[in-house]
């Protein structure tokens, strides 16, 4: 049986090369053709990257480590740096903001207003190695996920979440520790890759 597809393709390596993503095939970089990326020049790609359909990336600096997955319908926005460490994941419809308007009413809001009339907060967002962000979660400017931190679905991250914790809620709070078994799996994967190269 033939599988019929509509808008199910990732950009070709030639298309990625034209956007300035060098050696995309050997680095295993996949960007879906329906993703909206405002400026490819502001993205640093590691290896083994996958950006799924209908994701919108409109941020000043995006740093993606190795083995990073940005799932369907995610949004990454802002003028401060957003960085995702090795083996980090943001699940479907997750949102990351490195900039936010002032909601107090003391200034005007939105990008149609000249900057002199707004009071936008810009703060770097750092997602450490082995972090997992659950579906429909939101990270606000200045959020820091230390290594191994996991965020449950539909949570709101404000500030720092400790390493190897599982946090949930609005705002997200740690509820228990997370196992570190994935560190052993990372070493096994590294050895497996070396064996493949022999």
Predicted regions and their residues:
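Extended, small-residue-rich solenoid/repeat segments and analogous flexible loops
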Residues: 1-48, 193-198
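Conserved beta-strand-loop-alpha-helix hinge in the C-terminal portion
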Residues: 164-167, 171-188
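Beta-rich strand-turn-strand
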Residues: 125-126, 136-149, 155-159
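Glycine-centered loop/turn positions within well-structured domains
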Residues: 82, 94, 155, 163-165, ...
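Outer-envelope exported proteins of Gram-negative bacteria
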Residues: 85-93, 148, 152, 164
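Short arginine-rich
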Residues: 159-164, 194
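Flexible, glycine/small-residue-enriched loop-and-beta-strand segment within the central core
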Residues: 11-13, 33-45, 50-141, 170, ...
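Short secondary-structure boundary/capping segments
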Residues: 20-21, 27, 86, 117, ...
